Amino acid sequence: MTAIDVPWLSTPRRDNSHGTRSNSSCQPSCTQRIAVPISPDAVKYPLAVFCFAWAVTLGAYLDSQELVIGFAFHGWDGDTSIPSAGTCRIRIRPEQEILPALDEVVADGDKGLRSWVAQGAGSETDIAIQRKEVGDSLHPAVHGDEKLSPEIIITPSGNQGPYHVQGRFDPHIVAPALAHMMLHQFAFAVQGIVRGQSSIASSQVKDLQAISPDGMAQLMRWNRQSAAEEDGACVQDLIQRTCQQQPHAMAVCAWDGSWSYQELDCQASHLASQLCDHGIEPEKFVGLLFEKSKWTTVAILAVLKAGGAFVLLDPTQPAAYLSAICTMTRTALLLCSSHNQRLAAELRQTTIQVPRDPYHGAMPTSDFRRQSSPAVQPHHTLYACFTSGSTGRPKGFIIDHVAFNSGLQTYAHATGLGCDSRVFQFASYSFAPSITDQLASLIVGASICVPAEEELQNDVEGSISQLQATWLKLTPSVARTLDPGRLPCVKTLILVGEEAQVSDVAAWQDHGITVLGLYGQSENAKGTMVSRKSSEDADPGNIGSPFCAVGWVVDPDDYHRLMPIGATGELLLESPCLCRGYIDNEDETKLAFVSKPSWLTQVRGQGTAQPLLRTGDIVRYNCVDGTFCLVGRKGNRVKLRGQRLELAQVEHHLRSCLSSTHPVLADVVQPANENGRDPMLVAFVPWADSQSAADATDGFFAPPTKDFQTQARAVLGRLRHLLPSFMVPSTLLAVRTIPRTGTGKIHRRRLQEAASMLSRKQLMAYISPFIPYRAPETELERKLQRACGRLLNIEADQISMQDNFFDLGGNSLTARQLVAVARAEGLQVSVAQIFQQPTLAGLAQTHRHPVRRAEVPRSSHDPDPFGRVRDDVRREGLPHIARGNIEDALPVLYTQMTTARDHCVDFFPLRVIGGQLDPEQLRLAWTRVIQAFPILRTVFPRFRGRFIQLVVRDIGDSNFYRVVEAPSGQTAEEWARALCTEAIQFRCPVDRPVAQLTLIQAAGSSALVLRLCHAQYDGSCLEHLVRSLMMAYHGRPLVVESDFQAYTRTCLRLRIPEVLDFWRRFLAGSSPTQLASSMTGDREAARKINRSFFRREVNSLAAPAGFTLATVVKAAWSWVLRNETRSEDVVFGQLVSCRGSVPLPHADTIIGPCMNIIPVRVGRDLLGAVQAQHAQTMEFDMIGMDEIVRHCTSWPAGTEPDSIIIHENFHVDWEVHDGGVTIQKIAAVFNQQPSSLTFLITIPTETGLIAVLMAPANMSSTHADRVLDLFCNTLTRLAWSPAAVLRRSE
């Protein structure tokens, strides 16, 4: 209990049956005295007046309207008609007039004061009225030999007064400063009652609970220190000043490159001129749709230079949510990165991609001036930001330049932000702190450190260290995942969003790091209060003092009434940093922004017109120093993991998804026995069916049924496309009846309390079916079980390997923590894998520990069992290749064989942005890359009738690098596409070097074309290849941890009995499913005719609970094959990536085709079989299809799967930034050879996937369309209602 808490009135209780005190070790030891300047003769009914005044005072501090007061009344002229001691129960009605209220106290039934008997209810405090000083103790009839805290002793000083009031309190429970303030408030109440007795004018009881004159005087002293003035500058002007003062200082240091202040200014000026051409001017919004990137800062500054206002759009949020934001702000233009082009298209806005085409000619000047529209004024809009709203729409507000700049220097000083700070840009773009971190840093001359999104998910600590960030702004939950000892670069930590514990602060302070707390509202730019945290803080809830605002504590239900100092109330904020109000929401604005409270007019005068913000936060003053302590939130506003949300907005979308006219509620619930863990957002849905009625009990909740689980999962899936993830409930509960209060209102608290009696597993059972317990079977599984138990505060043996990590209480934050803990145990997992395989069993299958692969035998006396191939080739020789030029020779892998056989040579045009590349420097860089990666020097000749991969030492100078001038009138990119389209028509021999880089130059632009055989690459390695090229171009060393030769040797060594036996068992009695058998036309003839392409886009798609999207794709295709071929047992092929399977260091950076085609076999159980097979085959997925057919089946030699699934779960579009130059992948040109096989390619998107069917020539277009439609429809049904599809398939 802290010294500011006041549940002290209920500590000692009178035992009703014996009339004596309970034992209490709490002894009053702090005495406070004041004088009440009224005459005793003026007080009628002194006992009633003083008891009523004390009850009114306590009611204000306790927020209570009914109190029991113990009293002693003695030594008063020997009047024995009044009881000497007893208790009285007093009800406080704030709207009641004072005199009638006092009359009720006096009258209290027919007997008046004489009904207050000593045998009454236990009192909550004691008050004594005595004629003269009789010592420090109360009348013995009140408490015998024991003491009670607090005690009030009132003694008159003669007939003329004043009264002397003495209060005695336990200082461990009531701080002396608070006790002093309470006595002044008591004196104020007494005077008000006395005036009410003699005055004709009516006053209300609530007027007695308003702040006392002494309290107001103290407030004015404190608030003079917080007074703030407006700053009339514009943000872009302040940033421009920084750019001029320190042009060569680092402005942005990001994962994708960096900008000096001069470079930033130039880039932003160039983009600003384009924005002006699109009509951007003051009060027009530009939406910024970027992932974490250095280009976000450029876009922000460009919009400001053009005179416009910006709104940051977080690409992780649903398109519908972002579209609503664009509509509300009337967005005139959208700037987006190439990675977010598809999402931008869904928002249907005019869009400019950033970075765009390279500059024409020299770097643009930074001397940008607006000529075509009025100059930007400080009152113009700076940005809009959005939070959770109560109407079902996002709640947006506008911050202007004045609001942001006012108090900025005070903010910087208070938070330790200066020109030497390196600010870690952690906050999501959907939250206001991300904007402050950008703009404030640029104004003071700091460096903005921008991590990659992947690093924020998987390795925050490593990212901070790599960027050498010195200034962090994190929630305490995130800070707990970091080890300050491994971050010597950090100097300042700002904790936001949640209450920090003493242990949070101590962990960082022990390493000499300054820890501060920042409290504020998004509607108040930059934040409101800063507190210096200490491991010795008595009250972790202390949020400090305002740095550019004045805070007032008012009655939560009546902002015209200031609360006494030390009492809790709603924080009302007066500040020049406030926003203008809520966009297109006048009702919400009127509720939140209030003008001219009556008390403020008395303080400021009639000229006060600035609105004040009702924050919704319940706070109280620290009576010692005027700082604020945060107590909680008001009404239906809640905070979950540091993020504010309106329950009404969640409920609006729930009703919409459920099409319900019944009340649907949402609330934050703390599951049973989970103190210290994150609570859950839970939805309560009315539900009644026959099973619920049959199982009816006295409880609120119906038992979970399959039908409810299916509907609940579907609703959550729809919500994920409408709301940000933190606003989507973790579960839905089936409620038989909604409880109501006596007045008919919904009784939220009873529902919340009932749900809090359930465990997390019981809560999650409403969306997930019951799964029997499975104990861990391997050491890997036991490690994961222990790690989850430690992170989630659950006994390890209570966790089943079939449990869903997120159903156990995991979230995106604990997923990051699990990655860190797992890596400490030597387990390589990522956040993405946790989301894809949320069960512990699935996660254990995803991880490939090197020890397991080490079991693959390798002859000790023959370090390279394939060396004989190289020796034989050197001895026998090959045409066109000198023996001395042969560096290595190996058998080809299965996918290499198929692509070399079909002469698959592909072309990749690459856009160059940011400057011209030097041709000679690029040639030398490409030479270094070819020497570093042997696969680029590999050719694929036939040797003894079979393809081999042969690595040559020197590929020659004739064709590996070219420089081409684009014809006049064509850009480099246009000519690159033309060259690729022409070159693809010619067959390129693969028994000679294929890898080639072409530099295309045009006036003011350049482009690259990369030519590779598909036997040399896969889609995952192209970005790393181009990144290595740019590293070599800028003179940095190339580090190759593993190459494709090592990968090939590892795969070829897997021809061992264990692996072959697995595939024999797996494929026993099967045969490849021939989709072509249902087609018309000659299969052999189809091998010579080009294939046709058919494309569909599937939106609003999410995998069912416990399954991945890849599993659903394969299950849907297997259902299509069953439907087309009438076969119960189907076998098809799947292209898999083996980078996660091979036990080689940094396998993700290998340049080469680390992929394979393996068979997929599915019986009647679609989803379950596919998911199980995925886990089983990962141990054996590096053996080629030809080896499987030859050694593990009775199929004819050369059998291939008739249809092959390719699920591209990697980034198809990418760009590489290095040294001010950006290389951007654009549409590739593939050499599509004729084939009789059917390929289904699925590419995940933000909201679903794109499906492409590559049909052989003997499949008619009508048939192909029907097959693809059937696949897409099945895919959608499986995602939304797998049970329905499975029932239909039986």
UniProtKB/Swiss-Prot annotation:
Q: What class of enzyme is it?
A: ligase
State the family named in the UniProt similarity comment for this chain.
Answer: Belongs to the NRP synthetase family.
GO CC terms = cytoplasm
Q: Which InterPro entries match?
A: ACP-like_sf (IPR036736), AMP-bd_C_sf (IPR045851), AMP-dep_synth/lig_dom (IPR000873), ANL_N_sf (IPR042099), CAT-like_dom_sf (IPR023213), Condensatn (IPR001242), PP-bd_ACP (IPR009081)
Condensation: annotated segments:
914-1162
Q: What is this protein called?
A: Nonribosomal peptide synthetase 6
UniProt comment concerning the protein's domains: NRP synthetases are composed of discrete domains (adenylation (A), thiolation (T) or peptidyl carrier protein (PCP) and condensation (C) domains) which when grouped together are referred to as a single module. Each module is responsible for the recognition (via the A domain) and incorporation of a single amino acid into the growing peptide product. Thus, an NRP synthetase is generally composed of one or more modules and can terminate in a thioesterase domain (TE) that releases the newly synthesized peptide from the enzyme.
- What ranges does the record give for the region Adenylation, renumbered to this chain? 260-657
**Where in this protein does the record say O-(pantetheine 4'-phosphoryl)serine is found?**
812
Q: Name one GO biological process term.
A: secondary metabolic process
Which superkingdom heads the taxonomic lineage of this protein's source?
Eukaryota
Annotated stretches, region: Disordered: 1-27, 846-870
SUPFAM superfamilies in the cross-refs: Acetyl-CoA synthetase-like, ACP-like, CoA-dependent acyltransferases
Which GO-annotated molecular functions does the record name?
A: ligase activity; phosphopantetheine binding
Q: State the species of origin.
A: Aspergillus fumigatus (strain ATCC MYA-4609 / CBS 101355 / FGSC A1100 / Af293)
EC id: 6.3.2.-
Cite the Carrier domain residue spans from the record: 775-851
The record's keywords, sorted A to Z, are: Ligase, Phosphopantetheine, Phosphoprotein, Repeat, Virulence
Q: What does this protein do?
A: Nonribosomal peptide synthesis (NRPS) is a key mechanism responsible for the biosynthesis of bioactive metabolites which are potentially contributing to organismal virulence.
